[in-house]
A protein has these predicted regions:
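Short glycine-centered segments of the SAM/dcSAM-binding site in methyltransferase folds
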Residues: 42, 136-137
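Conserved class I S-adenosyl-L-methionine
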Residues: 1-38, 52, 76, 83
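A short glycine-rich, Lys/Arg-flanked "PGG" loop and its adjoining helix->strand segment in the class I
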Residues: 122-134
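C-terminal alpha-helical "lid/dimerization" subdomain adjacent to the S-adenosyl-L-methionine
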Residues: 18-21, 137-202
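A conserved beta-strand element that flanks and buttresses the S-adenosyl-L-methionine
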Residues: 110
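Class I SAM-dependent methyltransferase SAM/SAH-binding core
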Residues: 44-99
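Short catalytic micro-motifs in class I SAM-dependent methyltransferases
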Residues: 113-114
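Helix-to-beta-strand junctions that scaffold the AdoMet/dcAdoMet cofactor pocket
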Residues: 86, 118-119, 132-133
């Protein structure tokens, strides 16, 4: 089964899992501690799923575009946004940022547990860098390196990354045009009686000759 299809089928009940809610609350807290947010900021959520992270942080920024390759996730995200009364500032868009081009210039990009599903990570990082203004901030929450693949052991057709080595990810971010790369521990995930670490990585879009200005703070 293709991953997009799996997420399409899981979307309707995804937020029913208390573990997912606990994780997103922890990631939202970590982002608030690591990134200065303001009401004029334009945000893009990369692989935002049901939009829960963006809904949790919505009151701290100006607008958010929640992107996800899964049509099912995007449909649920838009429903959640409307129920939360946030449709004037948040919207969900089906997009795979490794292949699809989006318009706009964003002050912040955030993501939770999405990057490890992306095979072309370098391509995604370059795409996100291209969407950010100079000085724009990136916040990635994802799995620490899981060498034996235990976290995804129940998915025999998983083709993503088994977590990330922090130093290697920092090098990829630098090559993609980011500076000030920093890591912190965000939370842990308990699965099959094992704990898996979740980091928050933040970075800053380096200035470019054709860069775009950030929103007024």
């Amino acid at each position: 089964m293709h991953e997009h299809q799996r997420f399409d089928e899981a979307a309707a009940t995804w937020d029913d899992d208390p573990g997912h809610e606990k994780r997103q609350v922890a990631v939202a807290r970590a982002i608030k501690e690591a990134v200065t947010l303001s009401p004029r900021m334009r945000v893009i959520d990369v692989g935002g799923g049901t939009g829960r992270l963006s809904i949790l942080l919505a009151d701290l920024v100006g607008s958010v575009v929640v992107t996800d390759p899964s049509a099912g996730m995007v449909r649920v995200a838009q429903e959640r946004i409307e129920v939360a009364g946030l449709s004037d500032r948040l919207r969900a868009v089906q997009a795979d940022l490794t292949t699809d081009r989006l318009d706009g210039a964003y002050d912040v990009a955030w993501s939770s547990m999405a990057f490890h599903h992306v095979q072309d990570l370098d391509g995604l990082l370059r795409s996100v860098a291209g969407l950010l203004v100079d000085g724009g901030r990136l916040a990635i929450a994802d799995l620490d390196e899981d060498p034996d693949g235990a976290f995804h052991a129940d998915k025999v057709d998983f083709e993503g990354h088994h977590g990330f080595d922090r130093q290697r990810l920092a090098e990829q971010l630098t090559r993609a045009g980011f500076t000030d790369v920093s890591f912190s521990d965000a939370t842990t995930i308990l699965k099959d009686d094992r704990e898996f670490g979740l980091f928050l990585c933040t970075a800053t879009k380096a200035p470019s000759p054709t860069g775009r200005a950030p929103a007024s703070r």
